[in-house]
Amino acid sequence: MIGYLEGTLLKKKEDRILLLAGPVGYEVLLPAVVMASLQGKREGDPLFFHIYHYQTERQPKPVLIGFNTEEEKDFFHLLITVEAIGPLKAVQCLTLPIGEVAEAIETGNSALLGQLKGVGGRTAQKMIATLKGKVGRFADAGHSSAPDVPVTGSLADQTVEVLVGQLGYKPNEARLMVAGALKRNPDVSTPEALFDEIFKHGQAQ
Protein backbone atom coordinates (compact mmCIF):
# COMPACT_ATOMS: atom_id res chain seq x y z
CA MET A 1 0.00 0.00 0.00
CA ILE A 2 1.51 3.32 -1.09
CA GLY A 3 1.14 6.08 1.51
CA TYR A 4 3.72 8.65 0.41
CA LEU A 5 5.53 9.52 -2.81
CA GLU A 6 8.40 11.88 -3.47
CA GLY A 7 9.96 12.60 -6.84
CA THR A 8 9.98 15.05 -9.73
CA LEU A 9 7.20 16.32 -11.96
CA LEU A 10 7.21 14.50 -15.29
CA LYS A 11 3.89 15.67 -16.71
CA LYS A 12 0.89 17.68 -15.53
CA LYS A 13 -2.59 17.00 -16.90
CA GLU A 14 -6.01 18.46 -16.12
CA ASP A 15 -6.71 16.52 -12.94
CA ARG A 16 -3.56 14.46 -12.34
CA ILE A 17 0.19 14.49 -12.60
CA LEU A 18 2.84 11.97 -13.53
CA LEU A 19 5.43 11.80 -10.76
CA LEU A 20 8.82 10.27 -11.48
CA ALA A 21 10.07 8.50 -8.35
CA GLY A 22 13.31 6.71 -9.17
CA PRO A 23 12.84 4.76 -12.40
CA VAL A 24 9.05 4.56 -11.98
CA GLY A 25 6.43 7.07 -13.07
CA TYR A 26 3.32 7.19 -10.87
CA GLU A 27 0.05 8.71 -12.04
CA VAL A 28 -1.41 10.66 -9.12
CA LEU A 29 -4.96 12.00 -9.16
CA LEU A 30 -5.28 15.39 -7.45
CA PRO A 31 -8.27 17.31 -6.08
CA ALA A 32 -8.65 20.76 -7.63
CA VAL A 33 -7.47 22.50 -4.47
CA VAL A 34 -4.25 20.46 -4.52
CA MET A 35 -3.75 20.97 -8.26
CA ALA A 36 -4.11 24.72 -7.75
CA SER A 37 -1.14 24.64 -5.37
CA LEU A 38 1.06 23.35 -8.22
CA GLN A 39 0.64 26.46 -10.33
CA GLY A 40 4.06 27.52 -11.50
CA LYS A 41 5.54 24.04 -11.12
CA ARG A 42 7.42 22.78 -14.17
CA GLU A 43 8.77 19.51 -15.47
CA GLY A 44 11.65 18.38 -13.28
CA ASP A 45 10.55 20.29 -10.18
CA PRO A 46 10.61 18.24 -6.94
CA LEU A 47 7.25 17.26 -5.48
CA PHE A 48 5.89 15.07 -2.70
CA PHE A 49 2.42 13.85 -1.85
CA HIS A 50 0.67 12.02 0.94
CA ILE A 51 -1.15 9.24 -0.89
CA TYR A 52 -4.55 7.62 -0.52
CA HIS A 53 -4.32 4.26 -2.32
CA TYR A 54 -7.72 3.24 -3.71
CA GLN A 55 -8.37 -0.24 -5.07
CA THR A 56 -11.44 -2.48 -4.81
CA GLU A 57 -12.96 -5.44 -6.63
CA ARG A 58 -15.11 -3.01 -8.60
CA GLN A 59 -12.09 -0.75 -9.14
CA PRO A 60 -9.26 -3.27 -9.69
CA LYS A 61 -6.91 -0.72 -11.22
CA PRO A 62 -5.06 1.07 -8.39
CA VAL A 63 -5.83 4.77 -8.10
CA LEU A 64 -3.39 7.02 -6.23
CA ILE A 65 -4.88 10.22 -4.83
CA GLY A 66 -2.41 12.89 -3.71
CA PHE A 67 -2.54 15.49 -0.95
CA ASN A 68 -0.11 18.19 0.15
CA THR A 69 -0.48 17.44 3.85
CA GLU A 70 -1.49 14.67 6.23
CA GLU A 71 -4.28 16.99 7.37
CA GLU A 72 -5.81 17.04 3.89
CA LYS A 73 -5.58 13.26 3.70
CA ASP A 74 -7.18 12.84 7.14
CA PHE A 75 -10.07 15.09 6.12
CA PHE A 76 -10.49 13.06 2.94
CA HIS A 77 -10.77 9.87 5.03
CA LEU A 78 -13.67 11.45 6.94
CA LEU A 79 -15.31 12.82 3.82
CA ILE A 80 -15.63 9.40 2.20
CA THR A 81 -17.58 8.12 5.21
CA VAL A 82 -20.52 10.21 3.98
CA GLU A 83 -23.15 8.16 2.17
CA ALA A 84 -22.90 8.53 -1.63
CA ILE A 85 -19.42 10.09 -1.48
CA GLY A 86 -16.79 7.62 -2.62
CA PRO A 87 -13.10 8.41 -3.16
CA LEU A 88 -13.48 9.57 -6.76
CA LYS A 89 -16.46 11.82 -5.98
CA ALA A 90 -14.60 13.20 -2.97
CA VAL A 91 -11.69 14.16 -5.23
CA GLN A 92 -14.12 15.86 -7.58
CA CYS A 93 -15.83 17.90 -4.88
CA LEU A 94 -12.72 19.24 -3.11
CA THR A 95 -12.65 22.53 -4.97
CA LEU A 96 -12.15 24.63 -1.84
CA PRO A 97 -9.51 24.40 0.89
CA ILE A 98 -10.44 21.83 3.51
CA GLY A 99 -10.58 24.51 6.21
CA GLU A 100 -13.48 26.19 4.42
CA VAL A 101 -15.30 22.93 3.71
CA ALA A 102 -14.90 21.89 7.34
CA GLU A 103 -16.14 25.27 8.57
CA ALA A 104 -19.18 25.01 6.30
CA ILE A 105 -19.94 21.57 7.74
CA GLU A 106 -19.55 22.73 11.34
CA THR A 107 -21.74 25.80 10.80
CA GLY A 108 -24.35 23.94 8.74
CA ASN A 109 -23.69 26.06 5.65
CA SER A 110 -25.39 23.81 3.11
CA ALA A 111 -25.46 26.61 0.53
CA LEU A 112 -21.67 26.71 0.31
CA LEU A 113 -21.36 22.92 0.37
CA GLY A 114 -23.90 22.70 -2.44
CA GLN A 115 -21.56 24.76 -4.62
CA LEU A 116 -18.91 22.04 -4.56
CA LYS A 117 -18.78 20.08 -7.79
CA GLY A 118 -21.07 17.08 -7.71
CA VAL A 119 -22.62 18.05 -4.37
CA GLY A 120 -26.29 18.97 -4.48
CA GLY A 121 -28.54 20.00 -1.63
CA ARG A 122 -29.25 16.46 -0.46
CA THR A 123 -25.59 15.46 -0.36
CA ALA A 124 -24.71 18.71 1.42
CA GLN A 125 -27.20 17.82 4.15
CA LYS A 126 -25.72 14.33 4.42
CA MET A 127 -22.25 15.85 4.83
CA ILE A 128 -23.49 18.02 7.68
CA ALA A 129 -25.42 15.20 9.35
CA THR A 130 -22.48 12.79 9.15
CA LEU A 131 -19.51 15.04 9.88
CA LYS A 132 -20.72 17.93 12.03
CA GLY A 133 -18.82 17.81 15.30
CA LYS A 134 -16.03 15.73 13.77
CA VAL A 135 -14.18 18.22 11.56
CA GLY A 136 -13.78 21.23 13.83
CA ARG A 137 -10.02 20.79 14.06
CA PHE A 138 -9.73 21.19 10.29
CA ALA A 139 -11.77 24.38 10.36
CA ASP A 140 -9.62 25.71 13.21
CA ALA A 141 -6.47 24.94 11.23
CA GLY A 142 -7.62 27.29 8.49
CA HIS A 143 -6.96 26.93 4.82
CA SER A 144 -4.57 24.31 3.49
CA SER A 145 -1.20 25.67 2.55
CA ALA A 146 0.02 26.54 -0.91
CA PRO A 147 3.05 28.44 -2.18
CA ASP A 148 2.71 32.21 -2.12
CA VAL A 149 2.89 33.46 -5.67
CA PRO A 150 2.29 36.88 -7.18
CA VAL A 151 -1.01 37.36 -8.96
CA THR A 152 0.01 37.31 -12.58
CA GLY A 153 -1.57 36.51 -15.90
CA SER A 154 -0.14 33.03 -15.47
CA LEU A 155 -1.97 32.52 -12.16
CA ALA A 156 -5.24 33.71 -13.68
CA ASP A 157 -4.76 31.58 -16.80
CA GLN A 158 -3.96 28.45 -14.83
CA THR A 159 -6.96 29.02 -12.57
CA VAL A 160 -9.11 29.22 -15.69
CA GLU A 161 -7.56 25.94 -16.86
CA VAL A 162 -8.53 24.22 -13.60
CA LEU A 163 -12.08 25.61 -13.76
CA VAL A 164 -12.49 24.44 -17.36
CA GLY A 165 -10.50 21.23 -17.46
CA GLN A 166 -11.24 19.83 -14.03
CA LEU A 167 -14.43 21.51 -12.86
CA GLY A 168 -16.30 21.58 -16.16
CA TYR A 169 -16.95 25.29 -16.65
CA LYS A 170 -17.03 26.88 -20.10
CA PRO A 171 -13.92 28.94 -21.00
CA ASN A 172 -15.77 32.26 -21.23
CA GLU A 173 -17.60 31.56 -17.98
CA ALA A 174 -14.36 30.65 -16.21
CA ARG A 175 -12.59 33.78 -17.45
CA LEU A 176 -15.45 35.95 -16.20
CA MET A 177 -15.36 34.22 -12.81
CA VAL A 178 -11.62 34.83 -12.44
CA ALA A 179 -11.83 38.41 -13.70
CA GLY A 180 -14.67 39.18 -11.30
CA ALA A 181 -12.79 37.71 -8.36
CA LEU A 182 -9.65 39.71 -9.15
CA LYS A 183 -11.69 42.89 -9.61
CA ARG A 184 -13.33 42.46 -6.20
CA ASN A 185 -10.08 41.57 -4.49
CA PRO A 186 -6.99 42.71 -6.41
CA ASP A 187 -4.79 41.81 -3.43
CA VAL A 188 -5.28 38.06 -3.96
CA SER A 189 -1.85 36.47 -3.55
CA THR A 190 -2.42 32.70 -3.41
CA PRO A 191 -4.26 30.10 -5.49
CA GLU A 192 -6.54 29.31 -2.52
CA ALA A 193 -7.48 32.95 -2.10
CA LEU A 194 -8.45 33.19 -5.76
CA PHE A 195 -10.62 30.07 -5.60
CA ASP A 196 -12.07 31.29 -2.30
CA GLU A 197 -13.04 34.62 -3.84
CA ILE A 198 -14.71 32.84 -6.75
CA PHE A 199 -16.71 30.39 -4.63
CA LYS A 200 -17.68 32.48 -1.63
CA HIS A 201 -19.55 34.94 -3.84
CA GLY A 202 -21.64 32.15 -5.29
CA GLN A 203 -20.27 32.37 -8.81
CA ALA A 204 -19.50 28.66 -8.99
CA GLN A 205 -22.80 26.87 -9.39
Swiss-Prot record:
Superkingdom: Bacteria
InterPro entries for this protein: DNA_helicase_Holl-junc_RuvA_I, NA-bd_OB-fold, RuvA, RuvA_2-like, RuvA_C
GO MF term set: ATP binding; four-way junction DNA binding; four-way junction helicase activity
Name of one Pfam family that matches: RuvA_N
Region (Domain I): 1-68
Domain III: annotated span: 152-205
Broad class of where this protein is predominantly found: cytoplasm
GO cellular component, one term: Holliday junction helicase complex
Keyword annotations of the record: Cytoplasm, DNA damage, DNA recombination, DNA repair, DNA-binding
Region spans: Flexible linker: 147-151
Domain notes: Has three domains with a flexible linker between the domains II and III and assumes an 'L' shape. Domain III is highly mobile and contacts RuvB.
Protein name: Holliday junction branch migration complex subunit RuvA
